[in-house]
Curated annotation (Swiss-Prot):
Gene this chain is encoded by: hslU
HAMAP family: HslU
Family: Belongs to the ClpX chaperone family. HslU subfamily.
Annotated protein name in UniProt: ATP-dependent protease ATPase subunit HslU
Main localisation: cytoplasm
Protein source organism: Thermodesulfovibrio yellowstonii (strain ATCC 51303 / DSM 11347 / YP87)
Length: 445
């Protein structure tokens, strides 16, 4: 994190997201401020709260991608939720506290994975020993046997088997293994609001039930894999994992709330606006800073970074309740994308669409070559369709590319070894009829 200066963060985001400089700058500063905060004395550190961000812009311009890439960049727990999916406490549906429970679950999986990787080598060695015990059980020594000689012979045979095991000679051999599993004998039918109770009840019942041993017949590589997982779980200190995960959520967690404009009310005192305002009021304590109870323990939300986003076509940011507006002090507007940006999106990012399609079809020995005029034609058509129908931003490129390469993808097995050039003429031939008919472009692209 020390090397991730705001400029460096923007450079990393540039590899995947075209344009939107002001949004990138805002998130880069917010992220750097987290690192700066960690260097302060504890008394001052607790006083500095994250500056939450409100992104305003149409769909498909990179709002979600900026937040997702940001979280991946710093290996922070990240969860994306849609504001419109939540209901007020007391109503059927998910309550807003489940956001923090989901974020804690993500952090638990991340930290557990990291701890598993640290003990992986040791776990594999133990798994190997268990497989060797099955292949060559310990002999029972009798009085008539020369015990020292038998031990030497057993050790030599075991080492030979170990060598064969590591060289893959025994990969096709089947063995019977015993795996431990806890089984709760019934499921609980519940709605989403009851999910936490259901999980806790299942875990509580699971701790009372004896471990069931299940016998399976598997190939040796699979046995090693299953034993490695089992041994790794034994080696991991789950108390330490839980403590680290909660700390990571509290200090580095990022929550992306999409479609926040859908819960903005227009000032009516009845109807759906009342419910929307209720969701905003439920969100407020979490964004402001409160303690949420999860199955892993209490989680404080004071220093979690919240990034909210919405198109705000109908509602305005000022339609959000004043208290919630005040909790998103940084506001950035994202620009609509046009032909120029589409050309760059198709070619520049590390995960550019054209690179993806070239790689996909190359797996079947079909080689695509896109000319510059072909790329510009794809971008131009995407812009035209966005203007004629709904503007869905860069997502339009996906639908246009799918339609353009539909026949090639379908007949790929018959086109082995061929090189296909995608130029402006090819693009027009495939898509011109659809573009001419507004009805067709509305339903197909």
């Amino acid at each position: 994190m020390e090397n991730l200066t705001p400029k460096k963060i923007v450079e990393e985001l540039d590899k995947f997201i075209i344009g939107q400089e002001s949004a990138k700058k805002a998130v880069a500063i917010a992220l750097r401020n987290r690192f700066r905060r960690q260097l302060l004395p504890k008394e001052l550190r607790d006083e500095i709260l994250p500056k939450n961000i409100l992104m305003i812009g149409p769909t498909g311009v990179g709002k979600t991608e900026i937040a997702r890439r940001l979280a991946r960049l710093v290996n922070a727990p990240f969860v994306k939720v849609e504001a419109s999916k939540f209901t007020e406490v007391g109503y059927v549906g998910r309550d807003v506290e489940s956001i923090i429970r989901d974020l804690t679950e993500v952090a638990m999986n991340m930290v557990k994975q990291e701890h598993t990787e640290r003990v992986q080598e040791k776990a594999r060695q133990l798994a190997e020993e268990r497989v060797l015990d099955i292949l060559l059980p310990q002999p029972r020594y009798t009085r008539d046997m020369n015990e020292a000689e038998e031990r030497t012979r057993y050790k030599e045979t075991r080492e030979k088997l170990r060598k064969q095991l590591r060289e893959g000679i025994l990969d096709e051999r089947y063995i019977e293994i015993d795996l431990k599993e806890k089984v709760v004998p019934f499921g609980i039918i519940s709605n989403v609001a009851m999910e936490e109770i259901e999980i806790n009840l299942k875990e509580m019942l699971g701790s009372f039930l004896p471990e069931k041993v299940k016998r399976k017949k598997v190939k040796i590589p699979e046995a090693i894999q299953l034993f490695t997982q089992e041994e790794a779980n034994k080696l991991i200190d789950m108390e330490k994992v839980t403590k680290e995960a909660i700390e990571r959520v509290e200090q580095t967690g990022i929550v992306f709330i999409d479609e926040i404009d859908k819960i903005a009310s227009r000032g009516s005192s009845y109807g759906p606006d009342v419910s929307r305002e209720g969701v905003q009021r439920d969100l407020l304590p979490i964004v402001e800073g409160s303690t949420v109870t999860t199955k892993y323990g209490p989680v404080k939300t004071d220093h979690i970074l919240f990034i909210a986003a919405g198109a705000f076509h109908v509602a305005k940011p000022s339609d959000l309740i004043p208290e919630l507006q005040g909790r998103f002090p940084i506001r950035v507007e994202l620009n609509s994308l046009g032909k120029e940006e589409f050309v760059r999106i198709l070619t520049e990012p590390d995960n550019a669409l054209i690179k993806q399609y070239i790689a996909l079809l190359a797996t079947e020995d079909v080689y695509l070559e896109f000319t510059q005029d072909g790329i510009e034609e794809i971008a131009d058509i995407s812009q035209q369709v966005n203007e004629k129908t709904e503007n869905i931003g860069a997502r339009r490129l996906h639908t246009v590319m799918e339609k353009l390469l539909e026949d090639i993808s379908f007949n790929a097995s018959e086109l082995k070894g061929q090189k296909i050039t995608i130029d402006a003429k090819f693009v027009r031939e495939k898509l011109s009829e659809i573009i001419k008919s507004e009805d067709l472009s509305r339903y197909i692209l």
